[in-house]
Curated annotation (Swiss-Prot):
Superkingdom, taxonomy of origin: Bacteria
Stated role: Specifically dimethylates two adjacent adenosines (A1518 and A1519) in the loop of a conserved hairpin near the 3'-end of 16S rRNA in the 30S particle. May play a critical role in biogenesis of 30S subunits. Also has a DNA glycosylase/AP lyase activity that removes C mispaired with oxidized T from DNA, and may play a role in protection of DNA against oxidative stress.
Gene: rsmA
Reactions listed under catalytic activity: adenosine(1518)/adenosine(1519) in 16S rRNA + 4 S-adenosyl-L-methionine = N(6)-dimethyladenosine(1518)/N(6)-dimethyladenosine(1519) in 16S rRNA + 4 S-adenosyl-L-homocysteine + 4 H(+)
InterPro entries, per database record: KsgA/Erm, rRNA_Ade_diMease-like_C, rRNA_Ade_Mease_Trfase_CS, rRNA_Ade_methylase_Trfase_N, rRNA_adenine_dimethylase, SAM-dependent_MTases_sf
UniProt KW keywords: Antibiotic resistance, Cytoplasm, Methyltransferase, RNA-binding, rRNA processing, S-adenosyl-L-methionine, Transferase
Miscellaneous notes: When overexpressed partially suppresses the slow growth and decreased 70S ribosome phenotype of an rsgA knockout; RsgA may be involved in 30S ribosomal subunit biogenesis. Upon overexpression also restores cold-sensitive growth of a missense mutation in Era.
E.C. number(s) listed in UniProt: 2.1.1.182
Species in which this protein is naturally found: Escherichia coli (strain K12)
Name recorded for this polypeptide: Ribosomal RNA small subunit methyltransferase A
Keyword RNA-binding annotated: yes
Pfam family, one: RrnaAD
Length: 273
């Protein structure tokens, strides 16, 4: 028996497809999302509608973004969901969530069982639309959720942690075993809730600068920041900000990265590209 086939659909490796089939897990996720009529609910990668059906039952209208042509067509003819659905057969990685929020007249509530092969770049794409998003609930590789929630001085703490926590309050919701999927992935999964900050706890003048600093620091995470960020900050400047130049990237808090970004934005602003 081919364990890549579920409900007559062959899971495509290039789309990173693993279909959720555990009813207890599905019910737990839907309860965590708590969808309400009148809200702008948007699902990324509905697949075989494991979450789409129970969420759709509670709603009059649901928007879905599905790259797989066969799955999008299958949803169009769904017996009870079809009339409720607005289907975008598009790549979520290039989708304009800001335009959709404007069209729907309210911030979006985004959810989905994300393909693990694109989950990290997709998170960064979504962060650029946090002013158009009310909240997000995603099933992700457990290791990615650990990185999203990690604090300084831990192995999991990295650029994703800093940028996620700059934009959002990140809350782990539920751990999910491989047996909850067809085909079962080789890794554990987890559900995470991300709520964009209503008021930024650490406002940054130019987020591109924060992105640059975190990229350079974590690309050389074994080096002290005196070395990894030496082209951007002198030892005197770091010390003046109360940041020890002997620290490594993983020792620096989100607040400190934002402080560094604001210093650089004021003293060496990036040119408009």
């Amino acid at each position: 028996m081919n364990n890549r086939v579920h409900q007559g659909h062959l899971a495509r490796k290039r789309f990173g497809q693993n279909f959720l089939n555990d009813q207890f897990v599905i019910d737990s996720i839907v309860s965590a999302i708590n969808p309400q009529k009148g809200q702008a609910m948007v699902e990324i990668g509905p697949g075989l509608a494991a979450l789409t059906e129970p969420v759709g039952e509670r709603l009059d209208q649901l928007t879905v973004i599905e790259l797989d042509r066969d799955l999008a067509a299958r949803l169009q003819t769904h017996p009870f969901l079809g009339p409720k659905l607005t289907i975008y057969q598009q790549d979520a990685m290039t989708f304009n969530f800001g335009e959709l929020a404007e069209k729907m007249g309210q911030p979006l509530r985004v959810f989905g069982n994300l393909p693990y092969n694109i989950s990290t770049p997709l998170m960064f794409h979504l962060f650029s639309y946090t002013d158009a998003i009310a909240d997000m609930h995603f099933m992700l590789q457990k290791e990615v959720v650990n990185r999203l929630v990690a604090g300084p001085n831990s192995k999991a703490y990295g650029r994703l942690s800093v940028m996620a926590q700059y934009y959002c309050n990140v809350i782990p919701v539920l751990e999910v075993p491989p047996s909850a999927f067809t085909p079962p992935p080789k890794v554990d999964s987890a559900v995470v809730r991300l709520v964009p900050h209503a008021t930024m706890p650490h406002p940054v003048k130019d987020v591109r600068v924060l992105s640059r600093i975190t990229t350079e620091a974590f690309n050389q995470r074994r080096k002290t920041i005196r070395n990894s960020l030496g082209n951007l900050f002198s030892v005197e400047v770091l010390t003046g900000m109360g940041i020890d130049p002997a620290m490594r990237a993983e020792n620096i808090s989100v607040a400190q990265y934002c402080q560094m970004a604001n210093y650089l934005a004021e003293n060496a602003p990036l040119q408009e590209s």
